[in-house]
Amino acid sequence: MSLDRIMNEAISPWMKGDGPDSDIVLSTRIRLARNLKNYHFPIMQTAEEANQITELFQQKLVNKTMRDFGSFELLKMNELTPLQRRVLVEKHLISPNLAETEFGACILSESEHISVMLNEEDHVRIQCLFPGLQLSEALQSANKIDNVFEEVVEYAFDEELGYVTSCPTNVGTGLRASVMIHLPALVLTKRINRIIQAIQQLGLVVRGIYGEGSEALGNIFQVSNQMTLGKSEEDIIADLTSVIHQLIQQEKAARELIVKNSSIELEDKVYRSYGILAHSRLIQSAEAATCLSDVRLGIDLGYIKDVSRNILTELMVLTQPGILQQYAGGQLGPEERDYRRAALIRERLRIEENEA
């Protein structure tokens, strides 16, 4: 595995498969937050301490112990260009916060479904990504990596509180479980705000696709647990799974309602969006996300039969600004990005050959 491959293949290998409920649930993520004993937390650590932690993981884990899990690559943020860091964020392999951290690093598996962030908000953040709804499977994978780390490093752990973290909401198990879910029908029927409020009352958080402070582009929402103290990993997973299953049923019911009451209007909306994607010469990322959401809904409902659902997932990633510029080989102005985005979408939908 090389940096060039990570940068030039916009779609991570793990994204190419389907998972359970993948018509509505795009992906599952498990993240475990850990800190090392006898080191200052990242907010207070020196450059020397940060580098010591990175070297510790490089020498004792990436080069040795983790070989049993396959090939891994350690990337230091201060050795990457701003554009390369942005691509990693857009592929959901690192957080926006890590991308801005001078002494941060990440460890990536070859399939990119395992990503370990070093010196972010906590010393160690183990992330596992799976397609569809696979919370238990992702947790099992993350725990395997965590167990390997714990044989080599000593974590900051309190017998009463659990794992000690920078943010109080992560103290305890250090577990953040999240699900990326596509809810266009709940948005169209204007039920989404009421449902989000109900979810938040259950102690869960609803955010946009890039986490805290981001918007729900393309009707894609990220639902995750908030507190970890006083709850077991199993309880956290069970609670979130229950809510996601309810969300899936609500979304399916909303889709059935729209088809029953407004079928022709919905079909028109789907094909208008498809027309924009198929023929536009300039398209901004927000408009592309909206149209891709409409077309994905049209595929799920059977209106569009000759386009793969996975192509839409792929295009949601491919059309992000950083990845577009990586493909172009450098920085692009806003209009040039919009032009290349439109061309890429047309090409991926195999429209150009029909227009020739």
From Swiss-Prot:
Its EC number is 2.7.14.1. It catalyses: L-arginyl-[protein] + ATP = N(omega)-phospho-L-arginyl-[protein] + ADP + H(+). PROSITE patterns: PHOSPHAGEN_KINASE (PS00112), PHOSPHAGEN_KINASE_C (PS51510). GO terms for molecular function: ATP binding; creatine kinase activity; protein kinase activity. SUPFAM superfamilies: Glutamine synthetase/guanido kinase. Keywords: Allosteric enzyme, ATP-binding, Kinase, Nucleotide-binding, Transferase. It comes from the Bacteria. One of its GO terms (cellular component) is extracellular space. A motif (RDXXRA motif of the pArg binding pocket involved in allosteric regulation) lies at residues 337-342. InterPro entries: Arg_Kinase, ATP-guanido_PTrfase, ATP-guanido_PTrfase_AS, ATP-guanido_PTrfase_cat, Gln_synth/guanido_kin_cat_dom. Residues 24-254 form the Phosphagen kinase C-terminal domain. Appears to be allosterically activated by the binding of pArg-containing polypeptides to the pArg-binding pocket localized in the C-terminal domain of McsB. ATP binds at residues 27-31, 92, 125, 176-180, 207-212. Catalyzes the specific phosphorylation of arginine residues in a large number of proteins. Is part of the bacterial stress response system. Protein arginine phosphorylation has a physiologically important role and is involved in the regulation of many critical cellular processes, such as protein homeostasis, motility, competence, and stringent and stress responses, by regulating gene expression and protein activity. This is Protein-arginine kinase. It comes from Bacillus cytotoxicus (strain DSM 22905 / CIP 110041 / 391-98 / NVH 391-98). The gene is mcsB.
